[in-house]
Amino acid sequence: MGHPPVSPSAPAPAGTTAIPGLIPDLVAGTPWPRWALIAGALAAGVLLVSCLLCAACCCCRRHRKKPRDKESVGLGSARGTTTTHLVQPDVDGLESSPGDAQQWGCLQLSLEFDFGSQEIRVGLRQAADLRPGGTVDPYARVSVSTQAGHRHETKVHRGTLCPVFDETCCFHIPQAELPGATLQVQLFNFKRFSGHEPLGELRLPLGTVDLQHVLEHWYLLGPPAATQPEQVGELCFSLRYVPSSGRLTVVVLEARGLRPGLAEPYVKVQLMLNQRKWKKRKTATKKGTAAPYFNEAFTFLVPFSQVQNVDLVLAVWDRSLPLRTEPVGKVHLGARASGQPLQHWADMLAHARRPIAQRHPLRPAREVDRMLALQPRLRLRLPLPHS
């Protein structure tokens, strides 16, 4: 008896345990059409390849991240430019490029001394990388140690860590006093209703600077000084101007942080026109307090054509005896002001008919009186008279 014939269409490969005809039988036994099975197989293949690619990318990122972290911690990998002539030779790494700024950032500064007029011109160009982790509203304050009471404040730059100042200020310093003079540049974060936050500062001994020619360099900022200048208090008030009627309204809200021991503090509001006393008003006195609350409003008629020529001075006075009064501190606003008072005045003009409130640090009376004569008038952009 012979063996039954074997179908040539389903040969069993040598050396395998697969059941002959298993896959064709499974395909034939499924209720789905063949094209659906092929499409499903292709989709499964694409999904498998995608998963493998994602896993490979994750592994590569982990391997790349580790050397970067190690490199950012090491100080030896920091790149910077050095020069053979340093403005401050006794301070290592003072000059640097903006990319090398450390925790407090850096400042670009130019210095020029006029031997004829005995003046030093300080050019504030820009700052970079002031503070990581969020934007600030920075401004700069410039002073010289030999010129007590004379300082310059820049305008506020909103929402930036790299403000561009492009402002120049001058200080009169006799050439003989240059070796002992120190230039101080302080940067602050502007806050309308609280104390301004220090961002860093630069102290540059002018005796170590070669002022025979114009200098322009980047300087690293250091931490703010632990001891801040003595404060005489703060005054909070609002300003409102209506160009069509010329009504300037000043609301004196409160003072705080005044020196203890004041008998009867009060606030005097004074308007000056073309550097001459024009109008003045004053609040009621508050007995025996270093934080008096006033909430008194005063209205002055200032024609729109005279806004650029007006100076507004708010001064806190103390009446210790019936016939004796002494100033505690003053705030000067107007087109000839600088820093935060100038910013407050500009905000009032830019937002006509709206009261703009702000808290200002009081400055010594002699300092404000001197600034009234020193500061040149700055033309501000005014609203339209019909607004």
From Swiss-Prot:
Its main location: membrane. It is found in: Cell membrane; Cytoplasmic vesicle, Secretory vesicle, Acrosome. It comes from the Eukaryota. GO terms for cellular component: acrosomal vesicle; axon; dense core granule; exocytic vesicle; plasma membrane; synaptic vesicle membrane. Residues 70-99 are annotated as: Disordered. The keyword Membrane applies. Belongs to the synaptotagmin family. Involved in the trafficking and exocytosis of secretory vesicles in non-neuronal tissues. Mediates Ca(2+)-regulation of exocytosis acrosomal reaction in sperm. May mediate Ca(2+)-regulation of exocytosis in insulin secreted cells. The first C2 domain/C2A does not mediate Ca(2+)-dependent phospholipid binding. PANTHER family: SYNAPTOTAGMIN, SYNAPTOTAGMIN-8. Homodimer or homooligomer. Homodimerization and homooligomerization do not depend on Ca(2+). Interacts with SYNCRIP isoform 2 C-terminus. Binds inositol 1,3,4,5-tetrakisphosphate (IP4). Binds to AP2 in a Ca(2+)-independent manner. Interacts with STX1A, STX1B and STX2; the interaction is Ca(2+)-dependent. This is Synaptotagmin-8. It comes from Homo sapiens.
